[in-house]
Amino acid sequence: MGKIIGIDLGTTNSCVSILENGNVKVLENAEGARTTPSIIAYANDGEILVGQSAKRQAVTNPHNTLYAVKRLIGRRFDEDVVQKDIQMVPYKIVKADNNDAWVEVNGQKMAPPQISAEVLKKMKKTAEDYLGEPVTEAVITVPAYFNDSQRQATKDAGRIAGLDVKRIINEPTAAALAYGMDKAKGDHTVIVYDLGGGTFDVSVIEIAEVDGEHQFEVLATNGDTFLGGEDFDIRLIDYLVDEFKKETGMNLKGDPLAMQRLKEAAEKAKIELSSSQQTDVNLPYITADATGPKHLNVKISRSKLESLVEDLVQRTIEPCRTALKDAGIDVSKIDDVILVGGQTRMPLVQKTVAEFFGKEPRKDVNPDEAVAMGAAIQGAVLAGDVKDVLLLDVSPLTLGIETMGGVMTALIEKNTTIPTKKSQVFSTADDNQSAVTIHVLQGERKQAAQNKSLGKFDLAEIPPAPRGVPQIEVTFDIDANGILHVSAKDKATGKQQSIVIKANSGLSEEEIQQMVRDAEANAEEDRKFEELATARNQGDQLVHATRKMLTEAGDKATADEKEAIEKAIGELEVAVKGDDKAAIEAKMNALSEATTPLAQKMYAEQPQGAAQPGAEESKDAADDVVDAEFEEVKENK
C-alpha cells in the first residue's frame, strides 16, 4: 500500500507533507519551495500554469489568472460573499446552471473544484517525484467552519485530481496534531488560532494522554470563512488607489493590469511591514494619460497598515469568545495558543491574540506548514503507521428535520463529536397518510423556515393507518469527513429512502453566524419582553390603586395634590402604552412621590390598627401572585 499524503489546500498557498520513518517531512516542489501559491493560469496557447509560474505571469494575464478560488468552493452565485468577491478579482465569476459560483476563462465556464484540482495535481506530482512511486490517496484539510457542501466540493476536487480522499479534516485540528506529536506528557487544552489567506478558524482542542495514546478531542470550533490575508491586502490596495487618485486624479480600479501590479506590491509591503517599521511601494509606469506616464510611489508605515486593518483583526476575537463559551472553558484554563496561517506573522495579530488569551502564542510551529504536517500524521494514522493518536472532530452546526407545525427537531446538536449516528422515531400527522417528506435542516433556530434547507426526500407507500400509528425511523449519520447521510425507514414495511447531502449549495459564514446570533438575540428579546410586560402590569396596578386612594381621600386631598397626582397618572398611562421599560419605572417612581404627602396625611388620621387605604388592594394582588405560583407548581408536578 502506498503512502497517504497530507495536503493543506490553502486559499493563498498549498503545502504537501508525508510521514517518513516516524518523522513528518514537508516536501519541496519542483521550484524548490516548501509551499506553492494556490494560483492557476490559463495561457493563450492552452497551457495550464500552477503555482509560482502562474503568479509570475499574472501581471500580463490578469483575466485568466485565478487565485483565492477556495473562497468560491461550494458556494451559490447569489450569496453576498460571492457578490463581494466579484468586485475584488480581475477574473470573471459567473452563475452556473445549478446556481453555483463558477469562473469563466477564455469563454469556458469552470467549477471551483476543477480549478482547485490543478493545485492538488501539483501537490500529488511533488509527492510522487519525492517518493518515486504513484500516489493515489490523500488526507486534505478544510477550514473547521466549512459546511457540508464546501467539504463535498473539496472531496470532488481531490477526485478530479486523481486522488482517493481518505479523510477531510479540519485545519486547526491538523495543526494541533502537528504540534501534539512531540508534546510533553499529560493532558492539556490548546487554542488553535488559524488566520490564513481567505479564512479564519479558531478551535478549542483537548489533548489527553490515555495509556500512552494521544487523544485529540475538538471541544468547540468557530470562525469566519470569508476573512483572511486577502482582505488585509484589499485594504492596502484601496489605500494605495486612494493615495494615487489624490495625487493624480486618476482611478486605477478600472485598469486590471495596474490592479494586478498593485496586488503584488501590497502583498509584498504587508509582509515587509511584519519585520520593518516602514516600506516604500514604488511602481513606475503604473498608468498613463495625455500628459504622459504616471508613477506610483507611496511610503507606508507599520502603524498606517495597522490602522487600515485593525477592525479585521478585532473581527477574529468574537469567534474566539464564542468557541470558549461553547467549550465551557475559561480563558485562564488554556495551556497553549498555536498560531496557524501566514497572516498570524503580523505583529498586531500576535499582540491582539496575546492580550485576549493572556499568554504569548507559541512560535515554534511553522504557521505555513503545520496544517499539512497534521494531515500527513492523520494519513499515517489511517494507514496504520501511527498507532498512538486518536482524532475526535466535531460538527459545527445543529442538524435536524422539519416536524409538524413548522418546527425544527434537532437530531445532532452543534459541536457533537464526529463520526456520529442518531436515530429518532416520528409518525404521520394525518389519517391514512401514504407518504412523508423528510426535510433536512441545518441551523440553530426553532422555526424550520429560519434555518438552512439542506435537502428533501419522500418516503412513500406507507400502509393506510390512523395518524400517529405508523413508525418512521429517521437516521442521521455524519461520517468522519463531516458529510451527512440521512435515511428514513417505515418500521412496518421495512421500506427505506436515503439521501447524501450533496454539494448543491452551502451555508455562507454570514448565514451561519446570523443563525447563531438570531437564536441568541431571540432569547434576549424574549427576556426583555417578559420584563416589559411585568413593568406594564405593575404600572397598571399602581394607577388603579392610586385612583382608588384618591376616591377614598375625597376632600382630604388639596387641589394641588390632586393636580400633581392626576398629572403623574396621565404620564404613567402614556408610558405603559410604550415599549420603554425604564420610562415606565421612572413614571411609577414619579407617581409614588406625588402620592406620598397625601398617603402620609391619610395614614396619620387613621384610627390605630385600621388598614391603610389601598392596602386591601395590595393584599389582594399579593394573594393573586401566590395563587398563580402555587398553581404553576402543581402543574409542573
Curated annotation (Swiss-Prot):
Residues 605-624 are annotated as: Disordered. The modification Phosphothreonine is found at residue 199. Disulfide bonds: none annotated. The keyword Chaperone applies. GO terms for molecular function: ATP binding; ATP-dependent protein folding chaperone; unfolded protein binding. Keywords: ATP-binding, Chaperone, Nucleotide-binding, Phosphoprotein, Stress response. CDD domains: ASKHA_NBD_HSP70_DnaK-like. Signal peptide: none annotated. It comes from the Bacteria. Induction: By stress conditions e.g. heat shock. Residues 605-615 have a biased composition (Low complexity). HAMAP family: DnaK. Belongs to the heat shock protein 70 family. Acts as a chaperone. This is Chaperone protein DnaK. It comes from Ectopseudomonas mendocina (strain ymp) (Pseudomonas mendocina).
